[in-house]
């Protein structure tokens, strides 16, 4: 099946907002951010700004998408200059896969954690390295929500602990938790393809025996963990709050993302009855809500 790709250039200040607009208002199937200077892609430490000064945005659409409508919507957003440059091209499946692989670089989170495409050389062999091939599942580390969760996991002492990755996607958070010292991780997702991607990536990282994955309806009864991370969306975080809170042991830790800054307080309020909520962490309008369950 062919695809349509639209390439735009943006500054580091507005790239995330443009990406969100392309997904929400033009029907983009995926949005990828690339450093226009083709230098390695790094995720910043908390409080630091993105290193890119010039960012290319690649938006992928179904072959039947109306490109005139898409360009009109981009212009109407007033996020780019009236005479902004863009490139439209048709990609066959194999061309898109090659393009994606060529542009997915190793990324560093905090002081010691690297997320590395399985086909790339490891930049720091002595660091904590997660080898990743996302396949059809969400989660490469390039989005602020994933970065916020990875940085939070790295900040914890996970030695000997059990972790639940609620909405595991590609398994990036689950595998990172194991690499950071967790004894066992349970991944839960509504998408069978995500479970398979998580299994494959765990096998690639040599941690398959420490990861179990389940559809929600198949998860063990009474499941509970020392640490729970849920990188999903604000709506499900509100609706599923009783379930998510029940997964956390007393005095256990919970982090949630997939939440915009305008949604953070409302989502946090669904958890304050059982958790002491930390100051909300923000990155590019996205937030992480974390806290410790009362004993």
Swiss-Prot record:
Record-linked Gene3D superfamilies: Vaccinia Virus protein VP39 (3.40.50.150)
E.C. code: 2.1.1.-
Binding site for S-adenosyl-L-methionine: 146, 167, 189, 231
Keyword Methyltransferase annotated: yes
Keyword Phosphoprotein: no
Reaction(s) this enzyme catalyzes, per UniProt: L-lysyl-[protein] + 3 S-adenosyl-L-methionine = N(6),N(6),N(6)-trimethyl-L-lysyl-[protein] + 3 S-adenosyl-L-homocysteine + 3 H(+)
Enzyme class per UniProt: transferase
GO molecular function, one term: protein-lysine N-methyltransferase activity
Subcellular localization: Cytoplasm
Family per record: Belongs to the methyltransferase superfamily. PrmA family.
Alphabetized HAMAP family for the sequence: Methyltr_PrmA
Protein name (Swiss-Prot/TrEMBL): Ribosomal protein L11 methyltransferase
């Amino acid at each position: 099946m062919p695809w349509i790709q639209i390439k735009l250039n943006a500054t580091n200040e507005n790239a995330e907002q443009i990406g969100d607009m392309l997904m929400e208002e033009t029907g983009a199937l995926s949005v990828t951010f690339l450093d226009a200077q083709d230098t390695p892609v790094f995720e910043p430490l908390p409080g630091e700004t993105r290193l890119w000064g010039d960012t290319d945005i690649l938006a992928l659409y179904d072959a039947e998408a109306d490109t005139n409508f898409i360009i009109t919507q981009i212009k109407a957003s007033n996020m780019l200059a009236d005479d902004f440059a863009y490139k439209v091209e048709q990609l066959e499946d194999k061309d898109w896969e090659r393009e994606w692989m060529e542009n997915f670089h190793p990324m560093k989170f905090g002081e010691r954690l690297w997320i590395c495409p399985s086909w790339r050389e490891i930049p720091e062999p002595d660091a904590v390295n997660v080898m990743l091939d996302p396949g059809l599942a969400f989660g490469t580390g390039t989005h602020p929500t994933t970065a916020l969760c990875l940085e939070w996991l790295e900040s914890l002492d996970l030695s000997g602990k059990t972790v639940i990755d609620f909405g595991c996607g590609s398994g990036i958070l689950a595998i990172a938790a194991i690499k950071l010292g967790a004894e066992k991780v349970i991944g839960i997702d509504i998408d069978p393809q995500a479970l398979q991607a998580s299994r494959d990536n765990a096998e690639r990282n040599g941690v398959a025996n420490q990861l179990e994955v389940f559809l929600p309806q198949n998860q063990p009864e009474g499941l509970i963990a020392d640490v729970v991370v849920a990188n999903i969306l604000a709506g499900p975080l509100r609706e599923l709050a009783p379930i998510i809170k029940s997964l956390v042991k007393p005095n256990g830790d919970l982090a949630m993302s997939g939440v915009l800054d305008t949604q953070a307080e409302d989502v946090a309020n669904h958890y304050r009855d059982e958790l002491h909520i930390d100051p909300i962490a923000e990155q590019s309008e996205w937030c992480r809500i974390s806290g410790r369950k009362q004993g």
